[in-house]
A protein has these predicted regions:
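RNA/tRNA-interacting regions in translation and RNA-turnover enzymes
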Residues: 1-301
């Protein structure tokens, strides 16, 4: 079960919500509220304000983060669920993500959204990264089923393409490195390539995310580009994508990030996914996607 770290001030602010002044929550009260998420307080650093919380609910990955815990407590306090406008059906979605043919044999699914207006804080960035790692490692089975990429939105020119390329066809500077590398070199040299490269083993083409100018965003599920994929404190325009092998899990993971960023004050906008093959969501769909909305599923002949 996941154990997460968070800042007490950050949790209190998220429980209060954007329109209220946060107040100090006694630890004994917090421990009672954590029962709502099957959580247990494992540690508290009074000097730094850090809380360590162990979560026991393996069926609720949306609770494996500061935002999810605060959301559940807020719902209990107010007696009503939270409505997110980005789940409403959009008449027109401005930004597109195009999936190339052939990815259905390797890593077929992708979901994405943008989030604008939340200026990333130190606590917020720590939570984004922690949630990214927990979901990819536990829910995403060490990135095999789900992996997540976070980017600075401003440099990206849409439409974004989810492409297949040869291992030596594309070069970029990956996070954690100072030099430009091919995908083959990343798999051989970069620590993340060595750790996760087996996911892509046996394929003579590899997945890459690029924008309309040809700028590389990432080599999923391995590593982001350093130029675009290194979110920093103070950034207020983000692009989030999730790739994987299970479409509902990919979409759910994207939903979690969208809700978390919205809870921090971001305006989340959907991205339209265009697939060359028919999926459970069709050939075109927008994410985030409301799993509670009615949906027509064609019967097999």
């Amino acid at each position: 079960m996941p154990t997460i770290s968070l800042q007490r001030d950050d949790l209190e602010a998220l429980i209060a919500g954007p329109d209220e002044t946060p107040s100090r929550i006694p630890l004994d009260q917090l421990e009672q509220w954590l029962m709502l998420v099957k959580g247990e307080l494992k540690g508290h650093n009074s000097e730094t304000g850090e809380l360590r919380i162990e979560l026991q609910d393996s069926n609720r990955p949306d609770l494996w983060c500061c935002e999810g815990i605060a959301r559940q407590i807020r719902i209990k306090q107010r007696g009503a669920s939270i409505s997110y406008p980005f789940f409403k059906k959009q008449q027109r979605v401005a930004r597109k993500l195009l999936v190339a043919p052939g990815l259905d044999r390797i890593r077929p699914y992708v979901a994405a959204c943008t989030a604008v207006g939340y200026r990333v804080t130190a606590s917020g960035l720590t939570q984004l990264i922690q949630t990214q790692e927990k979901l990819a490692d536990i829910f995403g089975r060490k990135r095999r089923t789900v992996s997540i990429g976070l980017y600075r939105l401003a440099p990206i020119v849409f439409p974004v393409s989810y492409d297949l390329v040869k291992p030596d066809e594309v070069r970029f500077t990956p996070l954690g490195m100072e030099t430009v590398m091919t995908l083959r070199e990343i798999l051989m040299v970069h620590p993340k390539g060595v750790e996760y490269g087996g996911i892509l083993g046996g394929h003579d083409q590899l997945p890459v995310l690029r924008d309309a100018k040809g700028q590389v965003l990432s080599f999923p599920p391995i590593i982001n580009s350093r130029e675009i994929g290194e979110v920093q404190i103070g950034d207020d325009q983000l692009f989030v994508e999730v790739t994987g092998t299970d479409l509902p899990m990919v979409a759910l993971t994207l939903n979690i990030f969208a809700a978390n960023l919205a809870d921090r004050g971001a305006v989340v906008a959907p991205v339209e996914i265009q697939s060359p093959v028919k999926t459970a969501f069709g050939r075109r769909w927008s994410t985030p996607i409301d799993f509670g909305a009615p949906r027509t599923i064609p019967l097999k002949a």
